From Swiss-Prot:
Main location: cytoplasm
Keyword set, alphabetical order: Cytoplasm, Hydrolase, NAD, One-carbon metabolism
GO BP term (any one): S-adenosylmethionine cycle
Residues that, per the record, bind substrate: 60, 135, 196, 226, 230
Transmembrane segments: none
Gene: ahcY
GO MF annotations, alphabetized: adenosylhomocysteinase activity
Cofactor: NAD(+)
Protein name, entry field: Adenosylhomocysteinase
Record: residues binding NAD(+): 197-199, 231, 260-265, 283, 318, 339-341, 387
Cross-referenced Pfam families: AdoHcyase, AdoHcyase_NAD
Pathway: Amino-acid biosynthesis; L-homocysteine biosynthesis; L-homocysteine from S-adenosyl-L-homocysteine: step 1/1
Enzymatic reactions: S-adenosyl-L-homocysteine + H2O = L-homocysteine + adenosine
Amino acid sequence: MTTEAAVLDYKVADISLAEWGRKEIEIAEKEMPGLMATRKKYEGKKPLAGARIAGSLHMTIQTAVLIETLVELGADVRWASCNIFSTQDHAAAAIAAAGVPVFAWKGETLDEYWWCTRQILEFEGGLGPNLIVDDGGDATLMIHFGYKIENDPSMLDKTPGNAEEKALLQQLKAVFAEDNQRWHKVAAGMKGVSEETTTGVHRLYQMMEKGELLFPAINVNDSVTKSKFDNLYGCRESLADGIKRATDVMIAGKVVVVLGYGDVGKGCAHSMRSYGARVIVTEIDPICALQAAMEGFEVTTMEEAVKEGNIFVTATGNKDVITLDHIKQMRDEAIVCNIGHFDNEIQVDALNNFKGATRINIKPQVDKYVFENGNCIYLLAEGRLVNLGCATGHPSFVMSNSFTNQTLAQIELWQNDYKVGVYRLPKKLDEEVARLHLGQIGAKLTTLTKEQADYIGVPVEGPYKPEHYRY
C-alpha cells in the first residue's frame, strides 16, 4: 500500500521509515568517499544551480547519497526507481522526508512504474527537466517515444507488443491529451543525459545511429571506474547476496551456469567459483569465450549446459537467452535468475503462459514452477535484477565510484553546451575518481619523477594511459 501526501510532492511505501533510512544513509556516506569529496570540492559553489534533474535509477541507500550530493551542488531533483523491485523503502522515505520529490516503492506494478517515471519529468510550473540521470534509459525512452507520438499520433492506436509497452503507452496517451506538444518542449530544454548501465548506453548508440537522439548523452557506464568496478566487483558480491537471501542454498558443490562473460558475467563467474561452485560459461563473443576458458571455466552452449546446471545466471543484456524450452529441460530444483538490466533475458512471459507448469509463490520475489513430470524450478525476482530484487544491490564503496562519475557527468553537461551525440568522460576525470577512493582502503600511490614522466611521455600528474588502453 502506498501513501501519497497531500502537501508534499512524493509517493513512497511508508514515510515513517524515514528515520531508519536516514541512519543507513549516514553509514553509507562514510563508505562513499568520492561523493563526499565532490561535495567538499564544490562547497558553496553550487555548480548545478538552476539545473532540474530527473533521476531514474534504483532508489537505494547509495542512491540517496547521490541525490543529496546533487541537491547540495544546487540542483532541483525529482527521482524514481528504474526497476519495479529495486527500491529500498526506507531510503525512499528518507529522501522524501528531506524534501526531495521521490516516486518509488518496492513492488510497483508496470502501470505504477511508468506513472512514477512520468512524475519525475514534470517539474513545478509545467517545466520539464534539463538534465537526466538514467539507468537503463527508461526516462530517456519516455521523452523520445512521446516525441515520436507527437509527430505521428497514429502510434497511440498501435497494439502494444507487451505489458510494459502497454503501460508506457497509457501514460503517453494521458500526456498527449493534456498537451500534444509536451515532449517537443521538454526535448528543446534538455542539456543532456548521463547513462549508468550497459543496456541504456546500447539504446543511446542505437538512437544516435538512426538519427533519432534528441539531446547529448554521456556514457558513464564505459568509464573505467564504473564498468571495471561496479559491473565486476559489485556483481562479485551482490549476486551471491541475492541468491542466498532468496533461497538459502549452499553454493559450494553446485554447477552454476553464467550466461555472458562481459564485465558483469566475469564478476558473477568469479563469485560463484569463490564459493566452491563448478562454473560453466556461455558466450557468443570469441574473445570473451577465450578469456573465460583461460580463467579455467568450462565454455559451452546453453544446449549443453542446461542439462548440468543447478543455478543459472543471465548477464548478457540480450533477450531470450534462457527460453521456455531451456527451462523445461532443467534439472529438478534448478534456480534461475538474471542480473542484466531488463527482464527479457529469461522468457518469463512464456513461462507464465505455459499451461504445463503451475506457479507457486514462495515469498516476495521467489516463485516455484512445478511441471507435469513433477520437476520444478525456482525463478528469482520474476527474472528482473536478482541482486536488487532479492537483496540490496552493490555495496556503498563500489557505488561511490559509479555515482561520482554520474555527478561529474551532470556538472559537465550543465556547464557546457554539447552537440547531440554520445560522449565519455575524459581519462583525467576517470583517474581522479579512482584517486578519491584509494585512501579509504589504505592504498598509496607512487609518484613519477619528472624524468620518468618524460621517459614514458606522460604528465607527472596524469593521465597515464591513452584512451584506447584496456584495463
